[in-house]
Amino acid sequence: MAAELHVELVAADRSVWSGEATLVVARTTSGDIGVMPGHQPLLGVLESGPVTIRTSEGGTVIAAVHGGFISFADDKLSLLAEIAELADEIDVERAERALELAKSDADAAAQRRADVRLRAVAVR
């Protein structure tokens, strides 16, 4: 049996995934980190990004994570996220609509900033 680590991926509102793995890759404020059995203990802050889990059975689990913490000690890895979704659970069309809405909001904000600048110039 290969060396394993126990992984718990938990969102603020639910347990997302739990099981045995041989490798977990996550994005932290210090950069991407890969954790394997026997890794030195660590505590870090998660950035928004993908988490990739190589399961003990040879499969791969991918999740989208937004903020939170990563903790590892004694071959137990905890990913405590503000928001986390397994890739299989994500509705692509809904995610694309949300992205377009965010882009349009950013454009509206840029237009507001430009309007304020123009009004400031008019007052001079």
From Swiss-Prot:
SUPFAM superfamilies: Epsilon subunit of F1F0-ATP synthase N-terminal domain. GO terms for cellular component: plasma membrane; proton-transporting ATP synthase complex. GO terms for molecular function: ATP binding; proton-transporting ATP synthase activity, rotational mechanism. Its main location: membrane. Disulfide bonds: none annotated. Gene3D superfamilies: F0F1 ATP synthase delta/epsilon subunit, N-terminal. Belongs to the ATPase epsilon chain family. HAMAP family: ATP_synth_epsil_bac. This is ATP synthase epsilon chain. The gene is atpC.
